[in-house]
UniProtKB/Swiss-Prot annotation:
Tissue-specificity statement: Expressed in the brush border membrane in the kidney (at protein level).
Entry keyword Disulfide bond: yes
Upper classification of the organism: Eukaryota, Metazoa, Chordata, Craniata, Vertebrata
Reactions accelerated catalytically: L-leucine(out) + L-arginine(in) = L-leucine(in) + L-arginine(out); L-histidine(out) + L-arginine(in) = L-histidine(in) + L-arginine(out); L-arginine(in) + L-phenylalanine(out) = L-arginine(out) + L-phenylalanine(in); L-cysteine(out) + L-arginine(in) = L-cysteine(in) + L-arginine(out)
Gene name in the database record: Slc7a9
UniProt name for this protein: b(0,+)-type amino acid transporter 1
UniProt source species: Mus musculus
GO molecular function: broad specificity neutral L-amino acid:basic L-amino acid antiporter activity; L-cystine transmembrane transporter activity; neutral L-amino acid transmembrane transporter activity; peptide antigen binding; protein heterodimerization activity
General function of this protein: Associates with SLC3A1 to form a functional transporter complex that mediates the electrogenic exchange between cationic amino acids and neutral amino acids, with a stoichiometry of 1:1. Has system b(0,+)-like activity with high affinity for extracellular cationic amino acids and L-cystine and lower affinity for intracellular neutral amino acids. Substrate exchange is driven by high concentration of intracellular neutral amino acids and the intracellular reduction of L-cystine to L-cysteine.
Keyword terms: Amino-acid transport, Cell membrane, Disulfide bond, Membrane, Phosphoprotein, Transmembrane, Transmembrane helix, Transport
UniProt family annotation: Belongs to the amino acid-polyamine-organocation (APC) superfamily.
Length: 487
């Protein structure tokens, strides 16, 4: 059998080079520092450098703008603490997927994987790489817009590079993440220190009467939260690689408690720094807030800002790829995707098929280029699944009392997150109804067709098609099923 011969070949190679033989499964290569870097590196992408104006546009004053940024950080921390309980109770990779499976059964878990793998994850990956490409191209096309084909080709190259790095080695992917996280923290520190210097010099005009003209409508507040929480997106990413964390019972909660508050403090201080240099009107008119800040504060070294923003975006893309590949891997292992997507590289011990699949889908999303609106309308779906997952935590407090809980958050924390999730789901639909929200719901529910056709009933003709495809891909990529499932 093919997988047996592949395993035997690997064992022969290992016996020649080393006395230690690792099982063909995901290895625990991610420590506390790498875990913190994954959280910080995935959350801090391009958003805080480019579009803090979105929060200001909906609050219309400085004071509430800063409060929204702080509140979003607190909400992300509360949500992550709930995920810490889930992640130490159910130590499987895949983020929300195994938790929904355990709490509500296979159908909600499948709909989450269907929506995430086809739209949410790869389109976000594509957008981050397009943002990276635009910043790099801007350095070579000064004063004019770079050709769309150049931007798309460079974005595709970035996707190929990141996918290759993560398919080659878990340790290499972690190392790249650590390097880019360090690089983005440099520019964060430069902006914060510059802002504090200006603040100490008495540039506090924009903070006087900071609540004047505040927008108080429910719709505007919900949109401000949406934009703020978009910049915090990634707070749950460490739960996607729980099986690869060393000592997850300690490192998962510690990485969350250190990483997300660190990001929150950085975001608030960066916004304060922006307001020491720009008036609210100037900030709203800026195309890229951090670049405008750099032009005014760092000239003639203002080129540093777009360079480090590019580093920041590529780091966020790497973190997204690193974690999202594990969702595909776990979905394949549960039979909710092609089985070959759950296979492990014999030589590299990485989920190479899942990562390659993810990269291909992301490149497809680059072709149309304008996919921001798609992600905007699916962002409410993200909070639908966040809310369902944390509801599952509450449900399992009563239905699965047998599960060991190394971490147990007070019950009011998941209840708060569930209520906020419900507000974020319903508020934009009620305030500004749009057909796109209905299309999004219909797309999610369309996953039921594929579930019953290919997962529940497992028609023979589908098996006859998938079996030879799996066989040839397995031999081509030298991958085998994991030797054991996590417990």
């Amino acid at each position: 059998m093919e997988e047996t011969s592949l395993r035997r070949r690997r064992e022969d190679e290992k016996s020649t080079h080393s006395t230690e033989l690792k099982t063909t499964s995901l290895q625990k290569e991610v420590g506390l520092l790498s875990g913190i870097c994954i959280i910080v590196g995935t959350i801090i992408g391009s958003g805080i450098f480019i579009s803090p104006k979105s929060v200001l546009a909906n609050t219309e004053s400085v004071g509430p703008c800063l409060i929204i940024w702080a509140a979003c950080g607190i909400l992300a921390t509360l949500g992550a603490l709930c995920f810490a309980e889930l992640g130490t109770m159910i130590t499987k990779s895949g983020g929300e997927y195994p938790y929904l499976m355990e709490a509500f059964g296979p159908i909600p878990a499948y709909l989450f994987s269907w929506t995430s793998l086809i739209v949410m994850k790869p389109s976000s990956f594509a957008i981050i790489c397009l943002s990276f490409s635009e910043y790099v191209c801007a350095a070579f096309y000064s004063g004019c817009k770079p050709p769309a084909v150049v931007v798309k080709l460079l974005a595709a190259a970035a996707i190929l590079f990141i996918t290759t790095v993560n398919a080659l080695s878990v340790r290499l992917g972690s190392y790249v993440q650590n390097v880019f996280t360090a690089a983005k923290m440099v520019i964060v520190a430069i902006i914060i220190i510059s802002g504090l210097v200006f603040l100490a010099q008495g540039n506090v005009k924009n903070f006087q009467n900071s609540f004047e003209g505040t927008q108080t409508s429910v719709g505007a507040i919900s949109l401000a939260f949406y934009n703020g929480l978009w910049a915090y997106d990634g707070w749950n990413q460490l739960n996607y690689i729980t099986e690869e964390l060393r000592n997850p019972y300690r490192n998962l909660p510690m990485a969350i408690v250190i990483g997300i508050p660190l990001v929150t403090v950085c975001y608030i201080l960066m916004n304060i720094a922006y307001f020491t240099v720009m008036t609210p009107t100037e900030l709203l008119q800026s195309q890229a807030v951090a670049v405008t800040f750099g032009d005014r504060v760092l000239y003639p070294a203002s080129w540093v800002v777009p360079l480090f923003v590019a580093f920041s975006t590529i780091g966020a893309a790497n973190g997204t790829c690193f974690t999202a590949g594990r969702l595909i891997y776990v979905a394949g292992r549960e039979g909710h995707m092609l089985k070959v997507l759950s296979y492990i590289s014999v030589k590299r011990l990485t989920p190479a098929p899942a990562l390659i699949f993810y990269g291909i889908i992301a490149i497809i999303y680059i072709i149309p280029g304008d996919i921001n609106s798609l992600v905007n309308y699916f962002s409410f779906a993200a909070w639908l699944f966040y809310g369902m997952t944390i509801l599952g935590l509450v449900v399992m407090r009563f239905t699965r009392k047998d599960l060991e809980r190394p971490i147990k958050v007070p019950l009011f924390i998941p209840i708060i997150v569930i209520l906020v999730s419900l507000f974020l789901i319903l508020a934009p639909i009620i305030s500004e109804p749009a057909w796109e929200y209905l299309y999004c719901v219909l797309f999610i529910l369309s996953g039921l067709i594929f579930y019953f056709l290919f997962v529940y009933y497992k028609f023979g003709w589908a098996q006859r098609i998938s079996r030879p495809v799996t066989k040839h891909l397995q031999m081509l990529m030298e991958v085998v099923p994991p030797e054991k499932d996590p417990e």
